[in-house]
């Protein structure tokens, strides 16, 4: 925020995440954080010059409403940037039985309603009443995939970060390893 001179408003449904964000953000940064439902944003139309969403869409059970809320709060000519978990187009390339089993495990483990393809979400954005009609999308898997193994090794590099959180965090972290490995496999398969 300071580097670019932005005023930033971050939202999450988690009061704990808001508390943590406030603790980690230097006072001089022009950032504020709010507990808010992304499917029911309490901002006026055209409030923001830019909207940035990172890995939130996979958690949304209504992708159209999610897109509508982001685009509604974006000023005309503003920028929307999204980074999210998507699937390949499952109509064009249906999943194998093994892929269906793994996809079910990923959705259940991380409590996601469903993944959709980049093209499907692009269509939702293009056809939205608040859209300028211009959407540029890309698959960045090859750039982001290496970070999956880093997330496992981070616990080994800094074990006190996990150990200090207590037994529940340790058990959860160990449970996450197979799911992270499955997600890595799934990213490579599309």
What kind of region is each of these model predictions?
Residues 17, 56-57, 86:
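Active-site-proximal loop/turn and secondary-structure-junction residues that shape catalytic pockets
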Residues 82-84:
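Acidic carboxylate diad motif detector
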Residues 64-79:
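A short glycine-rich, Lys/Arg-flanked "PGG" loop and its adjoining helix->strand segment in the class I
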Residues 93-189:
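Substrate-binding/catalytic lobe of Class I Rossmann-like enzymes that use SAM or dcSAM, i.e.
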Residues 39-51:
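A short acidic, Gly/Pro-enriched loop at the edge of an enzyme's catalytic core
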Residues 1-40:
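Class I SAM-dependent methyltransferase SAM/SAH-binding core
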Residues 49-62:
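A short SAM/SAH-binding and catalytic strip from SAM-dependent methyltransferases
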Residues 26, 61, 75:
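Short conserved AdoMet
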């Amino acid at each position: 925020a300071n580097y670019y001179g932005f005023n930033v408003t971050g939202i999450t449904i988690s009061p704990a995440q808001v508390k943590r964000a406030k603790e980690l953000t230097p006072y001089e940064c022009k950032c504020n954080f709010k507990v808010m439902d992304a499917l029911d944003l309490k901002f006026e139309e055209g409030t923001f010059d830019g909207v940035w969403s990172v890995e939130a869409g996979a958690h949304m059970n209504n992708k159209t409403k999610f897109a509508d809320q982001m685009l509604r709060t974006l000023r005309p000519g503003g920028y929307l940037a999204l980074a999210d978990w998507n699937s390949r187009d499952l109509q064009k390339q249906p999943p194998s039985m093994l892929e269906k089993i793994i996809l079910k495990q990923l959705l259940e483990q991380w409590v996601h309603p469903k993944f959709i393809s980049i093209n499907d979400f692009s269509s939702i954005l293009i056809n939205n009443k608040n859209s300028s009609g211009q959407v540029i999308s890309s698959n960045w898997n090859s750039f982001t995939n290496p970070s999956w193994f880093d997330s496992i090794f981070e616990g080994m590099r800094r074990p006190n970060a996990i150990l200090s959180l207590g037994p529940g965090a340790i058990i959860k972290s160990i449970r996450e390893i197979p799911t992270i490995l499955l997600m890595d496999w799934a990213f490579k398969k599309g």
